[in-house]
């Protein structure tokens, strides 16, 4: 799911006061409060690393009696620079080796805690109810799919073709055991978990005129994820035209980053980066603003990423999936409520 507006909007003052105000009323306020606490805790953790994130000085919750501001807020450092737009001097698209060294964490290893995936503040700006903690990557991925299927069944997602969309997420759910398995059981990092910024597009990066990374902002929906997601192909290194046109493959940017990691001696991370784009497709999913014909191209890309023939007859596939899941009560309710769809 892409580019849905968040249920909260952040505004920056010249003094670094970030105000979080709901676009909707009722229960959203408690979720806003959760995001405030989550972002503040994340920023305080990042202060112990070399990640160029804003320093956080204070936060307040709207309902607290000692909050004199009146709204939920975080008081943080204002970062210099401008938002990276994937372009720059001499056509420079990607950060070079010096950029990566400047922004490098002292060691790309896991959080100093026992191996669980913590509560998720959000998944792609849609579901703000905290999920987790999870004991395994499999549980984490399953929660993501289940939340989407619940929203489809409720009529909140893909109302024009809910049955087809639900079947796609059932397909993704069937692939989770493969996603959760590690490429090499001897690689320590593949069974540990890492803080990951929710935005893969790159506009959270602040750069100077030479495109040196000077800051990373907007941490309010950061989450803790398995290594394959943290260090695998993301939207920063994707070719979006391929994604929207049903083409699945690693890009030159995926391979370029893998080569850089290998050159720096991070062979395990390089292996994750150049493995495949399954997780990129898994979390990208479908686009809520697309027509059925456009969505079908995304589905074909998902099929290709997971080893299916992208030119599979979609009607035959749908019939097979319906037969396999005829005892899925939620699916049957969707058909009864919305019809079988295209």
Locate the predicted segments by residue:
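Short beta-strand-initiation
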Residues: 7, 200-201
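ATP-binding pocket architecture of kinase catalytic cores
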Residues: 2-166, 170, 175, 181-195, ...
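Intrinsically disordered, low-complexity intracellular terminal segments
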Residues: 82, 107-195, 201, 208, ...
């Amino acid at each position: 799911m892409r580019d849905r507006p968040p249920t909260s909007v952040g505004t920056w003052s010249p003094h670094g006061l970030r105000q979080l105000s709901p676009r909707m009323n009722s229960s959203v306020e408690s979720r806003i409060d959760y995001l405030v606490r989550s972002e503040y805790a994340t920023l305080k953790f990042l202060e112990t690393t070399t990640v160029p994130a804003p320093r956080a000085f204070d936060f307040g919750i709207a309902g607290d009696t000692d909050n004199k501001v009146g709204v939920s807020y975080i008081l943080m450092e204002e970062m210099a620079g401008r938002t990276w737009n994937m372009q720059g001097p001499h056509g420079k698209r990607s950060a070079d080796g010096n950029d990566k060294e400047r922004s490098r964490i002292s060691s790309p290893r896991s959080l100093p805690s026992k191996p669980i995936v913590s509560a998720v503040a959000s998944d792609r700006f849609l579901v703000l109810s905290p999920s987790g903690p999870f004991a395994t990557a499999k549980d984490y991925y399953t929660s993501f799919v289940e939340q989407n299927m619940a929203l489809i069944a409720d009529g909140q997602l893909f109302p024009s073709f809910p049955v087809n969309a639900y079947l796609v997420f059932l397909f993704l759910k069937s692939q989770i055991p493969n996603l959760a398995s590690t490429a090499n059981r001897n690689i320590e990092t593949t069974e540990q978990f890492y803080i990951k910024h929710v935005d893969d597009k790159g506009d959270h990066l602040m750069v100077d005129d030479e495109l040196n990374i000077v800051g990373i902002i907007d941490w309010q929906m950061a989450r803790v994820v398995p290594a394959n997601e943290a260090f695998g192909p993301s939207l920063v290194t994707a070719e979006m035209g391929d994604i929207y046109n049903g083409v699945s493959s690693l890009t030159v940017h995926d391979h370029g980053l893998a080569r850089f990691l290998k050159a720096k001696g991070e062979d395990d991370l390089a292996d994750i980066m150049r493995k495949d784009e399954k997780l990129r497709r898994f979390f990208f999913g479908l686009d809520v603003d697309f027509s059925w014909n456009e969505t079908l191209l995304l589905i074909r890309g998902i099929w290709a990423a997971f080893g299916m023939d992208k030119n599979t007859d979609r009607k035959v596939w749908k019939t097979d999936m319906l037969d396999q899941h005829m005892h899925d009560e939620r699916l049957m309710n969707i058909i009864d409520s919305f019809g079988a769809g295209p």
